[in-house]
Amino acid sequence: MDNNEELEIVHTPVMLKEVLSFIPENAKIAVDATLGEGGHTKAMLDLNLEVHSFERDSAILEIAKKRLKNYDKFHYYNNTYDKMIEELDDSIIGNVDFMLYDLGVSLFHFKKAERGFSFKDNVRLDMRLGLNEKSAYDVINGYSEEELERVLRDYGEISNARKMANVIVKERNRRKIETSRELENIIFHNTDKSQRYGKIHPATLVFQAIRIEVNDELNILEKSISNIPSILKQNGVVVVMSYHSLEDRIIKKFFKENEKTKNKDGIFKLLNNKVKLPTNEEIKSNPASRSAKMRIAQKV
């Protein structure tokens, strides 16, 4: 894939209007925890905000840099978003007006076939979002049966995690599982026939679980959100969009535990009692938004 092709793969920013509506009046500094191709960051730069954006994947960062090269107030960091405290200048920490987390995996990663994120492509198992050494191949072919069961159960919420882990180990003992298509076939043919053709492909949650393990996604998320109170200024706002229940549970728990109410001290005022969802119109025009859940909190 050449650079021209890469620049054509532009992820439509999810719930953009809603995101921008929560930026405080007279805001000056924003942090985009999940830059991707830069759609949300660009919109904030267009509002004349100084934006500090994090992206762990150097390939997609290059796309965003080219797209945003004419913005003087764009600052980027090629790192995971749990490293904000280490990366941001001391003059920024505690003075941020607005923070955004868009936790969805970018369209770029599914389109860039050599990563093996999609079981629709017959490519080597990889699934790395950044420079981490462990790949999906290493997890599938190197983890013990017990470790595989844990990953499938905890990160895929797969009811037959033990059976599926056992099947994977038996198959890899015959020969290494090299590609996404091989793994998909193993899962499909070891799923009950009654469940093979449901709304969700039987491999979907397995691939999700492996991807989360490879990239340590939930641990990084928990560490990062714990730093939000230190990074935001008073009355600053954070918006988090999640795309599966594991992420949303972490966000909901963190906000609830740190919510200020009449009966307890806390750090945040919750700006929405129920999660905000994309409109039907957005889902039609941008199907990738369909599972998005938005939570918003203000530091008090």
UniProtKB/Swiss-Prot annotation:
Pfam families: Methyltransf_5
UniProt feature coiled coil, ranges: none
GO cellular component, one term: cytoplasm
Subcellular location: Cytoplasm
Binding-site list for S-adenosyl-L-methionine: G38, G39, H40, E55, I85, D102, H109
Keywords tagged on the record: Cytoplasm, Methyltransferase, rRNA processing, S-adenosyl-L-methionine, Transferase
EC number from the UniProt entry: 2.1.1.199
Top-level lineage group: Bacteria
GO biological process per UniProt: rRNA base methylation
InterPro entries reported in the protein's UniProt record: RsmH, SAM-dep_MeTrfase_MraW_recog, SAM-dependent_MTases_sf
Catalytic activity: cytidine(1402) in 16S rRNA + S-adenosyl-L-methionine = N(4)-methylcytidine(1402) in 16S rRNA + S-adenosyl-L-homocysteine + H(+)
GO MF, one example: rRNA (cytosine-N4-)-methyltransferase activity
Family membership noted in the UniProt record: Belongs to the methyltransferase superfamily. RsmH family.
Biological role stated in the UniProt entry: Specifically methylates the N4 position of cytidine in position 1402 (C1402) of 16S rRNA.
Official protein name in the record: Ribosomal RNA small subunit methyltransferase H
Lineage: Bacteria, Pseudomonadati, Spirochaetota, Spirochaetia, Brachyspirales
